[in-house]
Amino acid sequence: MQVEVGQIVNTHGIKGEVKVKSNSDFTDTRFQPGEVLTVNHQNHEEQLTVLSYRVHKGFHMLKFEGINNINDVEQYKGDYLYQERDHEDIELAENEYYYSDIIGSTVFDNDNQPIGRVINIFETGANDVWVVKGEKEYLIPYIADVVKEIDIENKTIRITPMEGLLD
């Protein structure tokens, strides 16, 4: 199974580097040189091997083997990057989850009332924040005081909302 790890949002420079918006965790591992990513370009899967990786102004900058100029990489703008899930050899600590396990989960409050579905995750430094789409969009911090139970198998999450969190 493949998991989405980012989207190529633009080119950078003239030597074939791309600007990637990550929607994944463990980017330092996923994007390291030698890692193989899949791009689904015009309904055709292509394997791209990372040649170099760096972070620049909040974006992940990747260069792929065999792509040496802007013309070779321009075609991939807007395409999504994927990586094999079974390739994930990242050891998770207790209460750590892959983004792909959390995104798509339904969030419930203490009264078992659905709040919405996790549609995105972003890192703030101190903790992750989950974007939950329900009647409106909620930002749920992934902290022990709020997130009480995560059931990966059933894709459900139970939270105890702090005052004002769902206003």
UniProtKB/Swiss-Prot annotation:
**Pfam families found in the cross-reference section:** PRC_RimM (PF24986), RimM (PF01782)
Key words, A-Z: Chaperone, Cytoplasm, Ribosome biogenesis, rRNA processing
User: Which SUPFAM superfamilies does the UniProt record give?
Assistant: PRC-barrel domain, Translation proteins
A Gene Ontology cellular-component term: cytoplasm
Example GO BP:
rRNA processing
Chief site of localization: cytoplasm
Residues in domain PRC barrel?
94-165
DNA damage as a keyword? Answer: no
**Origin: domain of life:** Bacteria
Chain coiled-coil ranges: none
- rRNA processing as a keyword? yes
Q: Which GO terms describe its molecular function?
A: ribosome binding
Q: Any notes on this protein's domains?
A: The PRC barrel domain binds ribosomal protein uS19.
**Assembly and oligomerization:** Binds ribosomal protein uS19.
Please state which protein family the record places this protein in: Belongs to the RimM family.
Purpose = An accessory protein needed during the final step in the assembly of 30S ribosomal subunit, possibly for assembly of the head region. Essential for efficient processing of 16S rRNA. May be needed both before and after RbfA during the maturation of 16S rRNA. It has affinity for free ribosomal 30S subunits but not for 70S ribosomes.
Q: What is this protein identified as?
A: Ribosome maturation factor RimM
Query: Which organism was this protein described from?
Result: Staphylococcus haemolyticus (strain JCSC1435)
Gene that encodes the chain: rimM
